[in-house]
Regions:
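Acidic/polar-rich alpha-helix caps and helix-coil junctions
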Residues: 27-210
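Polar, glycine-rich mid-to-C-terminal structural blocks
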Residues: 1-17, 22
């Protein structure tokens, strides 16, 4: 494969397994998509779709060396806006303005009112905020905490929601939740065996064998 990302042979491409459905969820006018991913196919027949991530690869200096000078992301302004959207939705308020402020920056010169979100039901708003976070915070370690924290209209974690997940590349018409309700214990991590052995008073997280 050619060095399309200009990595200078230092680390290779970030070929994490991001689903095509996530790529497809971006509008063509949303500049985050092409700033985050590079799409590629396995053949001229457009088969074997895949995406390589372009985030966090740094830059090349005058000595032709790759420097990882990307800031370590903790919280960004877009995160604050979407937190506010989440809070407003929880309080039965209006969240669309916060979502649209994030989108306006993301679309830049491509922005058009047709891309604006209009407030809907609690469940619709919650899913919209989640999917906006999905597109905004790729590779930033937030997705799992988002789906566990956020809820549907019945107060159930979005980790159990089919609508919150993306279909697999191999079965694009089949949608399943991230976690089955029969495996609800997976919302919490198990305690590793070394820690349990070192402290006999510890008890394993319910749902896992000790």
């Amino acid at each position: 494969m050619q060095d399309t990302l200009d990595l200078k042979g230092t680390v290779g491409q970030f070929l994490h397994e991001y689903k095509k459905a996530l790529w497809d969820s971006y509008d063509d006018e949303d500049m985050r998509r092409d700033a985050t991913f590079m799409d590629h196919y396995g053949s001229a027949q457009k088969e074997g779709f895949g995406i390589a991530m372009k985030k966090g690869i740094g830059s090349v200096n005058s000595n032709n060396q790759r420097i990882f000078d990307t800031d370590i992301i903790v919280y960004r302004y877009a995160d604050v806006l979407l937190m506010m959207a989440e809070i407003e939705n929880a309080l039965s308020g209006k969240c669309a303005n916060y979502v649209n402020e994030v989108r306006k920056r993301a679309y830049g010169k491509n922005w058009h009112p047709q891309f604006a979100y209009t407030d809907g039901s609690y469940a619709d708003n919650e899913l919209t905020i989640l999917h906006e976070r999905d597109k905004e915070f790729v590779w930033e370690g937030k997705r799992w905490f988002d789906v566990v924290r956020m809820h549907d209209a019945n107060g159930k974690s979005l980790a159990f929601s089919v609508a919150a997940n993306y279909p697999n590349n191999e079965t694009p018409d089949e949608r399943v939740p991230l976690i089955k309700e029969s495996e609800a214990h997976k919302l919490l991590w198990p305690i590793d065996v070394n820690t349990l052995n070192n402290d006999p008073k510890l008890e394993q997280t319910p749902g896992y064998d000790k």
